[in-house]
């Protein structure tokens, strides 16, 4: 027979998600006045003497990256592709892996990873402000890659406590990456072209999320246990591309205070 959860109706869950998204949209629509906030930001910047570019340049996005900045942008975007290739392979295929390799019907492992990420977002932001985005992000990559590597040895009968600990590590590692990667991309922009750089980031991340289920599925058809090895390889490749990033970091608070 089929597992019990295979017969569940998921319509209520989707309905709740749709309702939450619609409520969020309504709140956003009636509480966020972007033109007003933009004017206030420009006025405050001018008052403090930190208005670095003209209104014309801001509107046209005319600011050009230097060669080194452009190289850093490409490396960051390559890293985004690589760690999304790794992480989303696991999130999209774990239910199949859990059933075929771990002998599990239904479990809360991915929920634990998400909960760990949510709890760690704020502390990670504080740490990033102290030691810089890049160092914090690199630590997150190591944590995520290590969790996936150890998980690749887990089999049916392995301790679920250990697996839950590994996914807690993965959740914290992923949160560390998420908190710091997008700001590193938009750090290279100016007011008028933040949208363009946001587009770069999401093009890279969504492209990876689109193709990695196909690639990981191909390797899992060959050998089902390849999922976590696949993810580990891509995550650690992202570590090496990030090593060469020289721009987009934040100045740690201590360094700022000493200026």
Language model: regions and residue ranges:
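Hydrophobic core of transmembrane alpha-helices in multi-pass small-molecule transporters
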Residues: 161-176
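Short amphipathic helix-loop junctions that connect adjacent transmembrane helices
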Residues: 90-109
């Amino acid at each position: 027979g089929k597992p019990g959860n295979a017969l569940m109706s998921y319509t209520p869950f989707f309905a709740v998600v749709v309702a939450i998204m619609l409520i969020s949209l309504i709140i956003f629509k009636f509480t966020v006045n972007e033109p007003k906030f933009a004017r206030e930001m420009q006025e405050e910047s001018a008052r403090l003497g930190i208005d670095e570019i003209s209104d014309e340049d801001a509107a046209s996005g005319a600011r050009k990256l230097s060669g080194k900045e452009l190289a850093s942008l490409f490396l960051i975007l390559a890293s985004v592709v690589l760690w999304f290739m790794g992480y989303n392979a696991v999130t999209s295929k774990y239910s199949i892996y859990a059933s075929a390799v771990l002998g599990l019907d239904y479990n809360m492992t991915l929920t634990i990873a998400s909960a760990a990420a949510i709890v760690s977002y704020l502390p990670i932001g504080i740490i990033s402000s102290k030691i810089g985005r890049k160092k914090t992000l690199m630590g997150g990559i190591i944590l995520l890659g290590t969790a996936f590597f150890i998980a690749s040895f887990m089999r049916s009968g392995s301790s679920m406590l250990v697996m839950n600990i590994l996914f807690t590590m993965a959740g914290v590692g992923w949160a560390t990456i998420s908190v710091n990667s997008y700001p590193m991309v938009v750090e290279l922009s100016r007011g008028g072209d933040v949208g363009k750089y946001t587009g770069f980031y999401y093009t890279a991340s969504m492209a990876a999320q689109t193709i990695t289920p196909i690639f990981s599925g191909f390797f899992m058809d060959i050998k089902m246990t390849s999922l976590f090895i696949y993810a580990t390889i891509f995550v650690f490749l992202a570590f090496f591309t990030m090593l060469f990033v020289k721009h987009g970091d934040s100045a740690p608070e201590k360094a700022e205070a000493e200026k």
